[in-house]
């Protein structure tokens, strides 16, 4: 046995079947108690098995000792044993039959069927063991029963011998009949039927009654019946469960049918509740469908197909039948003289021989069985549905045969529509296409009557013809009228969409490429992608394949961007090499332009841009998705043929010139589309990087002036992206004017917005135009504005002294009073920003102001035409007309001792932010004649370093506080930039208790008209309050910026000049806070007196002057104020909102920015600080480019995206929220009682506010930019 084990485990026995790398699939087999691993192919493939187990292996592979060991298992012969064993071995390998088959063939079948599997062997042994136990048990029972019978018989014989003696003959007793009720009933039935049959035979009656038929089912088979002819069993070898089914069908006779019916009646009589007998919900169609469904894929379907072919042959044979003569010959019977001699009397007398003549065989008429469907139908569609209903799902050829059989019947001509078409067989397929709803003429409401099954290639009826006969007739007449047009159109479409003929025919079959072939292809591929914008021709394997240019590449200049990462492609490839382009090239290289997906994968593997460690499964998956994408392109290059299961390259008939012509057309279309999508850019740019208006200089710099009238305002609400150029009215100009402004561009579009999907920008409907203008060399004369132009502002300049005039139109007040003018030296060129603002009208005064603010540029501005560079410096001069007696004046006074003028400074560089913000009166309707509709207006001119905050960083807590979360990365980014934010404390607005009445009166006073500079005037906002309550507070800036805080009254503290210049930006609108101002605020600028109207935010930038922001107690105006003085070393940008309140209206919210940049960092946590306290108002802005929300009037439009948009309604806000453009934006109605103290209007009406809320995140998103 040890030698057998070594032989079975010897590698020589397996031969070439075992792969050297061990990747072959092995199967374990149990041979004689030894577990052996054999290749699966060896066991499954008979040819391979007999190649291994062969005579050659016996002679050349096995050793002599192994052969001698195996010969021991052969039978031993007494004579000539060696030769006999050799003959047996030869017969064994030849496949001779050893009476019960060849042992090698039997072994191969056992190997193939898995009988040597260890598990099978185990269970077979257990089964044999169980059968042996059962056998032993049955043997025990048999012998036990036999023993009892023997003992009983022995006793009986002994008793008989003892009684009768030896001479008595033994009489065997017959076995007792079983008297069970079933046996008695059976005998009675048989006896009854026997008597009944004998009576009927005597009477000659052959009919049977129903009772007799039921009784006849008990009749046993008569022994006189001839045994039926045995049907040969032709078993088709297969692995299915139908191995034992007969191949030939048994024909049922009438006798068999009667027996079947009798058994069915008996079954119904005895088992009425059997499931097979419940036929309440069954119909004939269901039965036919169930019967036909069983034939699919079975052997019966194969034989039905063979029977159908035989019928077709029989039809052809019948057509070829001719008259045939039957040749008969006279048969000569052999003489039997012996018998004639023996019995002469028995033989009849001889009769003359009759010669049989030839008889003509007349062809019998073909008697066709009646069709299962009605031959007369309402229309052709009904006929087709009847055929499908009776036959079940049918293929197109079978339907055409059925229609042909129907057309050959005489009854078919009785249909009124029969003569419409000469051959209805040709119209079967078009009619089915129409009934399935796939026809192009069919309407969208068309209900299909049939459907086509792609898998089985069969048509199935889905609607019964009897249920919709009228509808079918109407469709039939419509189809007859339009079928010719449909066919012509479909034929043209088929011609256009037909598979193109390949340019070069080839018999090449795709196979793995050799190293040389792969090298040749990669070289061609390299040349192909050197010029991706041109077509290329691959020349491989004796044929050419033309591919078009790479889609989206229209010029030779390649992109410097890095290619997108792909798991299958190399990272160092060109950016335009994608998996789609490579699959397109592989499909183009298919031989004859068609092939399978596996062939495309094989061609793709030759590409040099594939990663080296890519597997075939990954390539197959990616190619599958790429082919689907190519299949659904606008101009698809591939399509899938379902019938042949091949991918077809549709562009194989195109030439390189045709490809390039189409590509050039696509390039032109893409260029035109891109030009339409681009926005109009400003004509010129500042060198500083801020997109502003450039100037058109001619000759020497001379003065220029601009007037902004009402016509410059947009008449209807619109987006800032569509600015309206302001008109230039005729105003007095200096004689030396030689430079004019040529273009005015809205400031809201000067900054290109960066794309951000998490940004919602909403701006006001009334967008006043902001323009940056340059003023040439100034003259010594000043011009004024006619008082009637209440909505205009002019710049009147003298030599080095520009002026900004604020014209206030009042009702009932003469406007002839002179204006206070302050002049300052100015450089030859100046830039201005014009800001129209609106004040709250009182009962006696309605004011409209337009402020023109000059902008100083620290760097040189290059003129586009002259090439000269000039340096500008300017000042602000605001004049106020005396309104009426008894009104308080408001002014901003600049000190003559200041070291520099007060200017709005424009700083160059990529990290500079310029911001101009306007704030108006909320809840106050502007006067149509004298005021500008500037309610809640936000304008922003920003640089490129605006921090983009994600929505998750802006949250609102349960108390209504808006929380701004800034990550350490954001703080580090801002700390490096030149822009530094400042924290504005709330103490400025809590100096005194707020009036309980909620009223605020604005007192306007003006200085007497005189050419000399008037005394400094103050802006007083005096709420009604108790005189006893006095307090003061100061405007605090963070010490980290080098700005000292004035803690004592009357003391001025300045910052050190050694500090570097820092731009402090107080961003408007991070939150809204109700005004708690309880003292008169005065803004004093150390310069000549200028007057600033109320409801205006002035953004002065102090270059070298001091700004004092004191708060004055309303009851003690003469008290020395406390303030903050910004030193000359720090350039600040300050926004100071001054608002008024009108009874019955909601006052404007004072914008209180609050930043956390000056907060000390503790660890890596997130710095969180409240923005505001109280409810959110209608003006939320200043979060970089993130959110600007204003009040929402009805009937305005929404433009989603990252551009500033108009007002939006509550419904549009809801739509925007559903689209994911905003986190949570809602309009909230706040009752008057819930408003903070001091901000509630006199009326108890609810106020609608826009609230932006976001869900706070546990881990904020860190975005550096």
Swiss-Prot record:
Residues 670-693, 705-738, 1000-1033, 1234-1265 are annotated as: Disordered. CDD domains: DEUBAD_NFRKB. Gene3D superfamilies: NFRKB winged helix-like domain (1.10.10.2430). One of its GO terms (cellular component) is Ino80 complex. Residues 714-729 have a biased composition (Pro residues). It comes from the Eukaryota. Residues 39-156 form the DEUBAD domain. GO terms for molecular function: DNA binding. Its main location: nucleus. Residues 1239-1265 have a biased composition (Low complexity). Keywords: DNA-binding, Nucleus. It is found in: Nucleus. PANTHER family: NFRKB-RELATED, NUCLEAR FACTOR RELATED TO KAPPA-B-BINDING PROTEIN. Binds to DNA. Belongs to the NFRKB family. This is Nuclear factor related to kappa-B-binding protein. It comes from Xenopus tropicalis (Western clawed frog). The gene is nfrkb.
């Amino acid at each position: 046995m040890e030698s057998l084990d070594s032989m079975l485990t010897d590698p020589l026995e397996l031969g070439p079947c075992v792969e050297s790398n061990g990747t072959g699939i092995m199967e374990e087999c149990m041979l004689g108690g030894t577990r052996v691993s054999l290749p699966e192919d060896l066991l499954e493939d008979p040819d391979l098995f007999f190649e291994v187990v062969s005579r050659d292996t016996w002679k050349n592979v096995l050793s002599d000792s192994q052969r001698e060991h195996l010969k021991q298992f052969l039978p031993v012969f007494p004579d000539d044993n060696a030769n006999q064993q050799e003959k047996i071995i030869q017969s064994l390998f030849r496949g001779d039959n050893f009476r019960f088959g060849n042992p090698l063939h039997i072994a191969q079948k056992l190997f193939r069927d898995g009988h040597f599997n260890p598990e099978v062997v185990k269970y077979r042994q257990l089964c044999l063991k169980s059968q042996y136990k059962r056998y032993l048990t049955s043997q025990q029972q048999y012998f036990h029963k036999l023993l009892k019978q023997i003992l009983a018989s022995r006793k009986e014989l002994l008793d008989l011998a003892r009684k009768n003696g030896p001479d008595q003959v033994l009489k065997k007793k017959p076995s007792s009949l079983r008297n069970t009720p079933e046996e008695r009933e059976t005998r009675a039935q048989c006896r009854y039927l026997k008597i009944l049959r004998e009576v009927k035979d005597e009477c000659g009656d052959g009919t049977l009654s129903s009772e007799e038929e039921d009784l006849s089912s008990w009749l046993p088979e008569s022994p006189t019946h001839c045994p039926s002819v045995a049907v040969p069993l032709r078993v088709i070898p297969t692995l299915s469960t139908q191995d034992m089914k007969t191949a030939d069908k048994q024909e049922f006779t009438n006798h068999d049918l009667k027996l079947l019916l009798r058994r069915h009646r008996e079954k119904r009589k005895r088992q009425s509740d059997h499931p097979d007998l419940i036929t309440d919900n069954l119909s004939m169609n269901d039965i036919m469908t169930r019967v036909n469904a069983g034939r699919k894929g079975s052997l019966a379907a194969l034989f039905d197909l063979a029977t159908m072919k035989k019928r077709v042959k029989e039809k052809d044979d019948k057509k070829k039948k001719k008259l045939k003569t039957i040749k008969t010959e006279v048969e000569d019977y052999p003489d039997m003289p012996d018998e004639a001699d023996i019995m002469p009397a028995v033989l009849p007398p001889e009769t003359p021989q009759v010669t049989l003549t030839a008889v003509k065989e007349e062809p019998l008429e073909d008697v066709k069985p009646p069709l299962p469907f009605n031959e007369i139908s309402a229309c052709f569609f009904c006929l087709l549905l009847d055929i499908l209903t009776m036959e079940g799902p049918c293929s197109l050829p079978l339907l055409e045969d059925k229609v042909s059989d129907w057309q050959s019947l005489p009854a078919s001509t009785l249909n009124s529509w029969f003569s419409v078409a000469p051959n209805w067989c040709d119209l079967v397929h078009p009619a089915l296409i129409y009934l399935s709803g796939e026809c192009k003429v069919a309407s969208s409401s068309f209900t299909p009557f049939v459907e086509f099954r792609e898998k089985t290639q069969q048509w199935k009826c889905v609607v019964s013809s009897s249920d919709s006969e009228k509808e079918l007739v109407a469709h039939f007449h419509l189809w007859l009228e339009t079928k010719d047009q449909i066919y012509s159109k479909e034929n043209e479409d088929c011609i256009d969409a037909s598979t193109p003929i390949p340019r070069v025919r080839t018999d090449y079959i795709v196979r793995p490429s050799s190293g040389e072939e792969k090298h040749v292809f990669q070289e061609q591929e390299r040349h192909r992608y050197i010029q991706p914008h041109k077509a290329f021709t691959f020349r491989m394997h004796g044929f050419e394949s033309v591919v078009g240019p790479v889609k989206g590449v229209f010029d030779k200049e390649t992109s410097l961007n890095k290619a997108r990462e792909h798991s299958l492609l190399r990272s160092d490839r060109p950016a335009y090499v994608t998996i789609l382009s490579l699959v397109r090239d592989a499909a183009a290289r298919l031989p004859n332009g068609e092939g399978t997906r596996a062939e495309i994968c094989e061609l793709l593997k030759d590409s040099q841009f594939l990663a080296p460690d890519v597997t075939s499964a990954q390539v197959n998956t990616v190619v599958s998705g790429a082919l689907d994408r190519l299949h659904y392109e606008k101009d698809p290059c591939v399509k899938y043929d379902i019938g042949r299961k091949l991918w077809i390259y549709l562009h194989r008939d195109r030439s390189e010139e045709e490809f390039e012509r189409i590509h050039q057309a696509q390039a032109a279309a893409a260029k035109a589309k891109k030009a339409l999508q681009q926005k109009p850019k400003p004509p010129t740019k500042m060198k500083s990087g801020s997109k502003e208006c450039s100037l058109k200089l001619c000759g020497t710099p001379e003065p220029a002036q601009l007037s902004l009238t009402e016509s410059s305002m947009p008449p209807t609400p619109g987006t800032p992206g569509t600015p309206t150029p302001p008109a230039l009215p005729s105003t007095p100009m200096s004689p030396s004017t030689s430079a004019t402004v040529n273009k005015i561009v809205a400031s809201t579009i000067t900054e290109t917005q960066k794309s951000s999907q998490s940004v919602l920008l909403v701006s006001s409907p009334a967008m006043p135009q902001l323009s940056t203008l340059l003023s040439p060399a100034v003259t010594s004369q000043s011009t004024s504005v006619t008082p009637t132009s209440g909505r205009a502002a002019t710049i009147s300049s003298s030599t080095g002294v520009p002026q900004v005039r604020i014209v206030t139109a009042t009702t009932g007040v003469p406007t002839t009073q002179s204006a206070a003018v302050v002049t300052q030296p100015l450089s030859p060129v100046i830039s201005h920003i014009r800001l129209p603002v609106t004040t709250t009208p009182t009962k006696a005064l309605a004011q409209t102001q337009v402020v023109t603010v000059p902008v100083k540029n620290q760097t040189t501005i290059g003129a586009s035409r002259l090439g000269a560079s000039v340096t500008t410096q300017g000042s602000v001069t605001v004049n106020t007309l005396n309104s009426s007696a008894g009104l308080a004046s408001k002014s901003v006074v600049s000190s003559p001792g200041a070291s520099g003028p007060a200017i709005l400074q424009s700083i160059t560089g990529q990290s500079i932010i310029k911001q101009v913000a306007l704030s108006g009166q909320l809840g106050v309707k502007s006067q149509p004649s004298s005021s500008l509709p500037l309610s809640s207006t936000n304008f922003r001119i920003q640089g490129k370093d605006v921090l983009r905050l994600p929505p998750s960083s802006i949250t609102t807590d349960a108390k209504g506080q808006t929380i701004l979360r800034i990550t350490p990365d954001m703080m580090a980014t801002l700390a490096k930039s030149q822009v530094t934010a400042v924290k504005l404390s709330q103490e400025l607005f809590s100096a005194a208790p707020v009036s309980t009445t909620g009223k605020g009166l604005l007192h306007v006073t003006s200085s007497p008209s005189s050419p000399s500079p008037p005394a400094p005037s103050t802006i007083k906002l005096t709420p009604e309050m108790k005189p006893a309550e006095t307090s003061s507070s100061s405007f605090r800036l963070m010490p980290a910026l080098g700005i000292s805080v004035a803690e004592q009254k009357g003391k001025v503290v300045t910052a050190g000049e050694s500090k570097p210049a820092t731009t402090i930006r107080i961003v408007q609108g991070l939150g809204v806070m109700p005004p708690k101002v309880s003292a008169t605020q005065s803004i004093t600028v150390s310069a000549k007196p200028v007057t600033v109207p109320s409801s205006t935010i002035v953004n002065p930038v102090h270059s070298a002057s001091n700004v004092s922001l004191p708060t004055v107690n309303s009851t003690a105006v003469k008290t020395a104020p406390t303030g903050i003085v910004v030193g000359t070393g720090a350039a600040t940008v300050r926004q100071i909102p001054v608002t008024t309140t009108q009874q019955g209206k909601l006052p404007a919210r004072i914008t209180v920015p609050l930043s956390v940049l000056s907060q000390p960092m503790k660890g890596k946590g997130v710095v969180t600080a409240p923005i505001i306290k109280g409810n959110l108002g209608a003006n939320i802005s200043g979060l970089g480019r993130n959110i600007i929300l204003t009040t929402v009037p009805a009937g305005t439009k929404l433009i989603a995206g990252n551009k500033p948009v108009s007002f939006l309604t509550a419904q549009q806000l809801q739509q925007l929220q559903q689209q994911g453009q905003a986190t949570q934006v809602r309009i909230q109605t706040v009752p008057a009682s819930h408003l903070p103290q001091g901000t509630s209007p006199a009326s108890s009406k609810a106020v609608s506010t826009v609230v932006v809320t976001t869900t706070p995140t546990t881990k904020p998103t860190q975005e550096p930019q």
